[in-house]
């Protein structure tokens, strides 16, 4: 597997993406959409929304959450098999000064939340956060961890573009086969464009964790925010064109790209 991944990195990445697309249908078979007949025959309890822990468990029992949980398991299993833990970014950020590069995505998060939060209580917030966390961990481990490590030997800019493209294609394929095309295109665009910023952070901080932090914070903010018309348009602009531009800015020339890498270089041992 490692020989194939290193010898044919692009085909390896396409194969993993296609495998995940197939897993989508397995997850939908596990949690099928139940057809609704005569609602008058349903018990009253059916119409009572769950509360507390019941709400959290109910929201987590979904095809999407199962899909990303399986993606996490697949990514970790392949990283263990290939031994790519350090190269995939499972290390401490060695470029601590570059943590300031999180400022722009976190500023977008703050803008997203500027109109307030729409929630029915702490349980709903916890449920949304856990669902978002599983999804962002799955996407980052696969695309900015495993696939990034396979592609980055050809340069960080190429790795950013290809991993973002594959992530966007996976999202549009999964969403378009189960929902309306406009929503699929919107989510795919956010995924593709966000990948530029998360991938650039991955390179500049030498770790996967800052990207996970930024991705989770933004996805959670979008999930709970109350967006007005103007704020919505501004957030969409910043999280698409803005994230692409920011990611390319962080990797704009060889001297800037040199301030980053896969992992922290090990100091030589003097004997």
Residue ranges and their predicted role:
Residues 1-86, 196, 202-203, 221-271:
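N-terminal, membrane-interfacial amphipathic/helix-forming hydrophobic leader that caps
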Residues 8-24, 98-110, 162-166:
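Alpha-helical transmembrane segments
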